[in-house]
Amino acid sequence: MSAPSSAAPLSVTITLSGGAALGAFHGGALSALLTGLRAASHEDAVRLDAVGGTSAGAFASILAAHAWLEGIEPVWLMNEAWVERLSVDLLRARAGSAPLSFDRLADRIDRILNPQEEGRDVHRVPRASSPLGLHVGLLNLHGLTFDLAVEGDGQGSTFDDWSQFVLQPGSGSHQLWEPEGSSPMEAVFASAANPGGFAPHRLDRSNHRDHYRENGITSFPDDGVFWYSDGGPLCREPVGRVIDAAERVIDGDERSGSLALVLDPRSEGPTDQAFTGADDVPSWMAGLKRTAGLLPAEAISDDLRRITKYNARIDAVRQVADALADSVDTELLGALIDIVNDTSGEPSSRSDDRLDDDADLTAVLAALTGVHGKKPVSCEVISPRLLDPDANTTQLLAGELLGDFGGFFDQRLRRNDFLLGWACATIWLERRAAIALGLDDQVLTALFDAVEEAAPDEEPDLDVAKASVTSSILPITTAAGRLIASNVAGLLRRTLATR
């Protein structure tokens, strides 16, 4: 395949879904992708501009960003974090205020991020030369109120919130902890605070007060502090917002196009004849499990459909603008610009939707159809179904039991999901890298050589996933016992302290 006609690199973003211990799948997939993209970026063929996600996806994203910007071998970093370290014992709360906590992880995360300071002989790779955007999806427990663009005193509210950052190459792990109270790492902990085990996490949003007000939010607290929980259930536009984070990094630089990669271990679809037919009555537990698996995936599916519609609308705007170019005079164009700017002045509208007085017809039509400032984006999904399109993801993922927390109880499950993620990302690279990334043969060879050299020695064992419930009873029971004992002890200490 020939090289891209434009000398500008392709913009790549990576969006990751939630999934608690299924972050091990993210870790394996990111290891393969970062290894391959780094090889391709050496030839200026691609540019990783942003990563992001919610919950486990947010934590995997910040690890990926650090590895990319600091030149740390991603296979080592992801394996160390997701397979070796992230267990229920590490997440067990100290004070007993909730079953789980990020306190121990916060104390030890720098040992993972800075292996050289621990005297570890970790293979270094060339670090990125350009900044990287980081998007973190959040669930705002207080809620955000805004005025509706209707007559009367109507108000709407949302609990969908987020943080975005621009991280610099070579700045070390310090940038992940600054500013205190609203740093990238603290935002990630807030996003990953699944209510099934973690207490809410607070963030100081004082520095973003003007941003909230510019976007019509009327319920900003005086001290600027909100409490947050796992952002996965309510994140409405995960892919689009990671693309927005990339735009902050690109900031006018040329790109030949845009590719949005989505890592989704829970990428569910219709399977066999399950949940069809009058005679095949599903059990209560089957319905509960199916619903729990579908809810996180639906937000990503909806966003991918939205981007597909935007792509079609962008193309239609271009065609209509070309057809009407000779029919729209300066006076009519000015009137249309005024209409757009009057609409974008509504409290609930984004401040950057306003048009300049010299905007052309294409920009006006784009604003009127909701695609102002947007560019066509290609989307690709990497999921366990790449390994077996006919299989249910529960047959492929080892750590999905116990509401996706099962992997935290058993390292074997995390390891298998890590290997599964690597295998699925490698399959995608083999099938789609040439087309989706627009790489020539020379760059492709460098990419595949790098991935092959970094590949783990093992392959995922699907028997581990199928037998995960029965084979993990002992480690889960043992770890659960320690967790319960720790929380009972914490409860007793608090009870005695109040007497």
Regions found by a protein language model. Give the residues of each.
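Active-site gating loop/helix substructures
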Residues: 132-251, 273, 278-308, 365-409
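Catalytic or ion-translocation cores adjacent to nucleophile or general acid/base/metal-coordination motifs
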Residues: 64, 74-82, 252-276, 288
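Long mid-to-C-terminal assembly/interaction modules of large eukaryotic proteins
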Residues: 354-355, 360-368, 402-419, 423-428, ...
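P-loop NTPase catalytic cores that bind/hydrolyze ATP
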Residues: 127-143, 226, 233-240, 257-260, ...
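Extended hydrophobic secondary-structure segments that form protein cores and membrane-embedded regions
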Residues: 13-16, 48-55, 133-139, 226-231, ...
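Acidic, Ser/Thr-rich low-complexity intrinsically disordered segments
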Residues: 435-499
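Patatin-like phospholipase
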Residues: 7-15, 21-120, 133, 140, ...
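Acidic, Ser/Thr-rich peripheral helices and adjacent loops at domain boundaries
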Residues: 274-361
